[in-house]
Curated annotation (Swiss-Prot):
Location, primary (coarse class): cytoplasm
GO cellular component, one term: DNA-directed RNA polymerase complex
Protein name: DNA-directed RNA polymerase subunit Rpo1C
Subcellular location: Cytoplasm
Function: DNA-dependent RNA polymerase (RNAP) catalyzes the transcription of DNA into RNA using the four ribonucleoside triphosphates as substrates. Forms part of the jaw domain.
Species of origin: Methanococcus maripaludis (strain DSM 14266 / JCM 13030 / NBRC 101832 / S2 / LL)
PANTHER family tied to this protein: DNA-DIRECTED RNA POLYMERASE (PTHR19376), DNA-DIRECTED RNA POLYMERASE III SUBUNIT RPC1 (PTHR19376:SF32)
Homology family: Belongs to the RNA polymerase beta' chain family.
GO biological process: DNA-templated transcription
EC number: 2.7.7.6
Record gene name: rpo1C
Length: 386
């Protein structure tokens, strides 16, 4: 049986396109040629698919909420080490779950999992070179001491030659970086730099000291540390800090697999669809790390709701909860007086189209049997044919 024959058989099937393709490939791979067997497989697959569909009128939102919320009560409040990487602390458990649904712009412990291209992933030295190019280096990280010299009225930097060499930098590189950021006169005494300003004073020198320490020399901004680990037959980099846009520009990085736990950053760089997938993955991984299993469709429901407007929105009064069309639904969530006061000032009308507002006014909700309207023919007589 050919692919074209299978496509014709599945043409009017209710199965989604992806499932149709996978089923066709499986039948061809197993070399099933008998037509009655193929028909039976398609029929059984269709029945199994239809059993997985939600019944009309099912309260999927409530089911999703309780399915995620109940395991959430069993989650720990502590921060654990990231899977297998003892040197990096990453927020897990309930705090991480709250971060995800709140759509925080910056996670409390941003981290990246950086995969390498075929040329780099099997060689530790090449992986270390990529790690050096990614790890952010500032003046403070290559210095033994940075202090204010009151006698000579300058800022003195004592450079660490070993650190400079390990990071592939030289003294002129440091001088050029400082000059590009600040207007200073620099005196070079081998590994000691004296930074002088036009009108020196203790206050002026102390004001410049933190800025000098933070001057960026090399690597990707915000990536404080990079750790190399061998997993199975390849080296993978784990970073403390996240900057996916700049990391993608580093030679040797596999941009198709590299990821970050910063969902808003994924949205900005890769788009809303990637952010949606990241929300599902992060929630599933956070629950799985605690030994909890939740059907992915509940997580997909939350992710779809957060991403439905094209940007990642938090589930709360500053996001989805505070933007509901119904005044009563908004008032029922949080900030009740504020919403009712605002609605009365503007003369809003609530159409009572949702669940919450109908419960508030005591009307049947449009779910389950309530989603059906029954019509009665008043002219109907018993025994009369319809």
């Amino acid at each position: 049986m050919q692919m074209a024959d299978l496509e014709k058989k599945l043409e009017n099937s209710v199965l989604p396109p992806l499932l149709k393709r996978e089923l066709s490939e499986k039948i061809l791979r197993e070399e099933i040629s008998e037509e009655y067997l193929v028909d039976e497989i398609i029929s059984e697959t269709t029945r199994a698919y239809e059993r997985t569909l939600v019944e009309p009128g099912e309260a999927v939102g409530v089911v999703a909420a309780q399915s995620i919320g109940e395991p959430g009560t069993q989650m720990t409040m502590r921060t654990f080490h990231y899977a297998g990487v003892a040197e990096l602390n990453v927020t897990l458990g309930l705090p991480r779950m709250i971060e995800i649904v709140d759509a925080r712009k910056e996670p409390s412990t941003p981290t990246m999992t950086i995969y390498l291209n075929d040329e780099f992933k099997g060689n530790r030295e090449k992986a270390a070179t990529v790690a050096k190019n990614i790890e952010s280096t500032n003046v403070e990280s290559v210095s033994e001491d940075i202090s204010v010299d009151l006698v000579n009225e300058c800022i003195t930097i004592i450079l660490n030659n070993q650190q400079l060499e390990s990071r592939g930098l030289t003294v002129p590189d440091v001088i050029d970086a400082i000059k590009s950021k600040m207007k200073l006169k620099i005196e070079d005494h081998e590994n000691v730099l004296n930074l002088k300003i036009k009108t020196p004073s203790l206050k002026a020198l102390r004001k410049r000291l933190p800025k000098v320490r933070a001057i960026h020399l090399k690597g990707v901004q915000n990536i404080k540390r990079v750790i190399i680990r061998k997993e199975v037959d390849e080296y993978i980099l784990y970073s403390e800090g996240s900057n996916i846009k700049e990391v993608f520009d580093i030679e040797g990085v596999d941009t198709t697999k590299t990821t970050t736990n910063n969902i808003v950053e994924i949205q900005d760089v890769l788009g809303i669809e990637a952010a949606r997938n990241a929300i599902i993955y992060e929630m599933d991984a956070t629950l799985g790390n605690q030994g909890l299993t939740v059907d992915k469709r509940h997580l997909m429901m939350v992710a779809d709701l957060m991403c439905t407007d094209g940007v990642v929105k938090p589930i709360g009064r500053h996001g989805i909860g505070g933007e509901k069309a119904s005044v009563l639904a908004r008032a029922a969530f949080e900030e009740t007086v504020k919403h009712l006061y605002s609605a009365s000032m503007r003369g809003y009308v609530d159409e009572l189209g949702g669940v919450v507002e109908n419960i508030i006014v005591g009307k049947p909700i449009s779910m389950g049997t309530g989603c059906i309207d029954i019509c009665i023919d008043k002219s109907y007589e018993e025994g009369k044919e319809l």
